């Protein structure tokens, strides 16, 4: 009985690790289209659901410990049961793949980004910034939303330095 439970835990860990690497490769546009369809079926991910990428970055004090804290805090905020996914693509930023309500949910996405920023501030991370891309309808387009969020964050450093949600 104990061996079966341990085996189940190992399987769940491997599935999460596979999902994490799949999402990272998807964000960075490192997958072929056929691989995307194959892996989404294996990992039980819905392909045609509206999603948006949010990029959370600590503006000052970009130590790894600080960003790791943000990752853990955001994973705790979102939880495993929601349709959202949290990962870290580089050492300075945390990525949230948020399951949007519809393709035209700009106000809801902005409110969610404000909520993420407020939650981080309540948890003691005061220098965070949140940028988000457009809502995309398919999983294969998620890298476009990520690139838009990344560009919004880069441009905001120059033109909108006072804004925390971009």
What role is predicted for each listed range?
Residues 1-166:
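Hydrophobic, helix-rich cores of sensory/ligand-binding and other regulatory modules
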């Amino acid at each position: 009985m104990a061996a079966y439970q341990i085996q189940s835990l190992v399987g769940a860990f491997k599935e999460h690790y596979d999902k994490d690497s799949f999402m990272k490769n998807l964000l960075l546009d490192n997958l072929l289209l056929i691989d995307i369809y194959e892996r989404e079926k294996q990992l039980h991910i819905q392909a045609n659901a509206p999603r948006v990428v949010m990029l959370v970055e600590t503006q000052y004090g970009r130590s790894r410990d600080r960003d790791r804290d943000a990752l853990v805090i955001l994973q705790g905020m979102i939880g495993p049961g929601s349709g959202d996914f949290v990962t870290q693509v580089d050492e300075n930023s945390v990525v949230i793949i948020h399951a949007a309500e519809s393709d035209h949910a700009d106000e809801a996405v902005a409110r969610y980004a404000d909520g993420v920023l407020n939650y981080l501030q309540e948890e003691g991370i005061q220098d965070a910034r949140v940028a988000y891309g457009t809502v995309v309808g398919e999983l294969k387009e998620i890298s476009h939303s990520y690139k838009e969020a990344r560009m919004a964050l880069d441009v905001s450093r120059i033109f909108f330095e006072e804004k925390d949600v971009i």
